[in-house]
């Protein structure tokens, strides 16, 4: 597809009438979400596979061009691990969490703000001057508190790792007002010592930012189809779930999924109407979630009578 300032390579076997049906299906969602803010947590395989990176950038450009305001928050676990290994710095994990020493924090900061952010900004800006990179340090965007998780029943020191405790979204608001796509790296100053920077969980940071900017949706990309009621039974994929039901499930979730679902709960508690977990391994999965009637993945909503339903049982 060609247009002023951008070029997407789209290959499809759909007939012309089928293509028209796809566009018509998107119409009510284009109307509903016009002018709305969508916070997207960029992660998983979508940020390491070159084709998926390109698809993600195209999705962000598409959202902006049709009148939505995407805001991207990213981590960079695989890239951080690769750089630490290349520099001969040991990576240690406790309870599934990376122990971040001052030496490792320098690498985290460098990789997130100087590599992952710059690459994504470049991919988006290949379609026009839309994206602007910033970190949680910029303009006091995030403030974090050092984290001491309970591991094996004891508070455990995992170094310069924190949780976002406050958000000043002024810098992001200014970029959105200017028609830009903010791309936010998940590092933040320590609220007890602003000269110290903490590595913060990108899922939680995205949820906090979504609440602060009044986003209509939080969308978290991951490497599974969504939340399963009875993993590994693939037929137990949950299409929609109320936040209170999800809150009760949190203690029993496996370690990889729990922080993502905790982020969904945090977003809903903060007033975001919808939070989604979708499979970022599938090209253009964000567009499928937002602009199709069935949607994909798992959607979390305020309860208000909403019962848990199996996938696609809308």
Swiss-Prot record:
Any single Gene Ontology cellular-component annotation: cytoplasm
GO biological process, one term: L-arginine biosynthetic process
Transferase in keyword set: yes
EC number: 2.7.2.8
Keywords: Amino-acid biosynthesis, Arginine biosynthesis, ATP-binding, Cytoplasm, Kinase, Nucleotide-binding, Transferase
Organism from which the protein derives: Bifidobacterium longum (strain DJO10A)
Name recorded for this polypeptide: Acetylglutamate kinase
Compartment annotation: Cytoplasm
Upper taxonomic lineage: Bacteria, Bacillati, Actinomycetota, Actinomycetes, Bifidobacteriales
Molecular function terms, GO-annotated: acetylglutamate kinase activity; ATP binding
Reaction catalysed by this enzyme: N-acetyl-L-glutamate + ATP = N-acetyl-L-glutamyl 5-phosphate + ADP
The family this protein is said to belong to: Belongs to the acetylglutamate kinase family. ArgB subfamily.
């Amino acid at each position: 597809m060609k247009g002023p300032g951008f070029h997407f390579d789209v290959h499809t076997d759909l007939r012309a009438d089928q293509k028209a049906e796809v566009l018509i299906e998107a119409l009510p969602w284009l109307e509903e979400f016009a002018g709305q803010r969508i916070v997207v947590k960029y992660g998983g395989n979508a940020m390491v596979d070159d084709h998926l990176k390109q698809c993600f950038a195209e999705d962000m450009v598409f959202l902006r061009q049709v009148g939505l305001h995407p805001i991207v928050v990213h981590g960079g676990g695989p890239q951080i691990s690769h750089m630490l290994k290349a520099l001969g710095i040991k990576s240690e994990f406790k309870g599934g969490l990376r122990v971040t020493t001052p030496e490792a924090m320098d690498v985290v900061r460098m990789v997130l703000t100087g590599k992952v952010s710059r690459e994504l900004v470049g991919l988006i800006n290949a379609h026009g001057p839309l994206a602007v990179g910033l970190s949680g340090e910029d303009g006091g965007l995030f403030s974090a508190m050092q984290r001491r998780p309970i591991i094996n029943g004891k508070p455990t020191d995992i170094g310069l790792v924190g949780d976002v405790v406050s958000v000043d979204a002024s810098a992001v608001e200014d970029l959105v007002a200017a028609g830009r796509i903010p791309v936010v790296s998940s590092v933040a100053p320590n609220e007890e010592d602003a000269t110290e920077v903490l590595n913060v969980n990108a899922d939680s940071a995205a949820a906090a930012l979504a609440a602060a900017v009044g986003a209509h949706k939080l969308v978290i990309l991951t490497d599974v189809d969504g939340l399963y009621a009875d993993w590994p039974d693939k037929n137990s994929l949950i299409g929609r779930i109320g936040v209170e039901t999800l809150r009760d499930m949190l203690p029993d979730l496996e370690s990889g999924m729990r922080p993502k679902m905790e982020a969904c709960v945090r977003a809903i508690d903060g007033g975001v109407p919808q939070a989604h977990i979708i499979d970022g391994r599938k090209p253009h999965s964000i567009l499928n979630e937002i602009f199709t009637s069935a949607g994909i993945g798992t959607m979390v909503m305020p309860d208000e009578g909403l019962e848990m339903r199996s996938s696609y049982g809308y």
